[in-house]
Amino acid sequence: MNFRRLKYFVKIVDIGSLTQAAEVLHIAQPALSQQVATLEGELNQQLLIRTKRGVTPTDAGKILYTHARAILRQCEQAQLAVHNVGQALSGQVSIGFAPGTAASSITMPLLQAVRAEFPEIVIYLHENSGAVLNEKLINHQLDMAVIYEHSPVAGVSSQALLKEDLFLVGTQDCPGQSVDVNAIAQMNLFLPSDYSAIRLRVDEAFSLRRLTAKVIGEIESIATLTAAIASGMGVAVLPESAARSLCGAVNGWMSRITTPSMSLSLSLNLPARANLSPQAQAVKELLMSVISSPVMEKRQWQLVS
């Protein structure tokens, strides 16, 4: 297979349009279509479905896309590794964070550490759900991702980082330093969607006690959740680091959830079938160092060894 055709194919899938991909690649659309046709002929498979709204990959196209991204990324890493011989590490390292994670406590110390140790490395931070971040890892669109516990995913390796207790956050009628699930069942709740780790843990606790949560809104965005809590319409369940950040933003209260106590494990996820680039490996080591630093250890979370 021709390297350039793989590059064209990946760009088409990323953009979802032959016309727009041709413009970005500075190639005539008929010529780009011919490159795709040649690739399909080499593989004896249809790779793209063409519709009025654009193009989407077939099942065979999805498989090729995953492998093509890995090939292109490895080539980029090889070029960079050769270029960096005898030079300071440089390039981009992409890190994903799931909403509500300890990102607010980790990212700034990490950025400062990278800036001090490897000033030529540029960090790209991306926030999305754990499921989306894992998919981006598999497709080699991210170097690593920090997410809350998730079911094992083929093509992704996980390394346990720490545990955080869950807290209730609000602005009206503080229940005290701690609150049990029976009391929470009487409150209006803002929760993330039902596939998130936080939601699964809350639903499990309510189900064991045959209680029904009064969910008045499902919110993924921390910014939107902050506005919702500030309005006084309801309360939210968050890990401690996110709870402290939101509580400070809305001048609210936070209560530790007891009976039962609830916690979530945070993990560092990596592509299972690809080696990290030298710069990504360096950033990973800094990330682990930041999490285990004395400043972080003072926070109310449990490091996982």
From Swiss-Prot:
<keyword id="KW-0534">Nitrate assimilation</keyword>
<protein>
    <recommendedName>
        <fullName>Nitrogen assimilation regulatory protein nac</fullName>
    </recommendedName>
</protein>
<keyword id="KW-0010">Activator</keyword>
<dbReference type="GO" id="GO:2000142">
    <property type="term" value="P:regulation of DNA-templated transcription initiation"/>
</dbReference>
<dbReference type="GO" id="GO:0042128">
    <property type="term" value="P:nitrate assimilation"/>
</dbReference>
<dbReference type="InterPro" id="IPR005119">
    <property type="entry name" value="LysR_subst-bd"/>
</dbReference>
<feature type="domain" description="HTH lysR-type">
    <location>
        <begin position="1"/>
        <end position="58"/>
    </location>
</feature>
<comment type="similarity">
    <text>Belongs to the LysR transcriptional regulatory family.</text>
</comment>
<dbReference type="InterPro" id="IPR036390">
    <property type="entry name" value="WH_DNA-bd_sf"/>
</dbReference>
<dbReference type="Pfam" id="PF03466">
    <property type="entry name" value="LysR_substrate"/>
</dbReference>
<feature type="DNA-binding region" description="H-T-H motif">
    <location>
        <begin position="18"/>
        <end position="37"/>
    </location>
</feature>
<keyword id="KW-0805">Transcription regulation</keyword>
<comment type="function">
    <text>Transcriptional activator for the hut, put and ure operons and repressor for the gdh and gltB operons in response to nitrogen limitation. Negative regulator of its own expression.</text>
</comment>
<dbReference type="InterPro" id="IPR036388">
    <property type="entry name" value="WH-like_DNA-bd_sf"/>
</dbReference>
<keyword id="KW-0804">Transcription</keyword>
<keyword id="KW-0238">DNA-binding</keyword>
<dbReference type="GO" id="GO:0003700">
    <property type="term" value="F:DNA-binding transcription factor activity"/>
</dbReference>
<dbReference type="GO" id="GO:0003677">
    <property type="term" value="F:DNA binding"/>
</dbReference>
<dbReference type="GO" id="GO:0045892">
    <property type="term" value="P:negative regulation of DNA-templated transcription"/>
</dbReference>
<keyword id="KW-0678">Repressor</keyword>
<dbReference type="GO" id="GO:0045893">
    <property type="term" value="P:positive regulation of DNA-templated transcription"/>
</dbReference>
<dbReference type="InterPro" id="IPR000847">
    <property type="entry name" value="Tscrpt_reg_HTH_LysR"/>
</dbReference>
<dbReference type="Pfam" id="PF00126">
    <property type="entry name" value="HTH_1"/>
</dbReference>
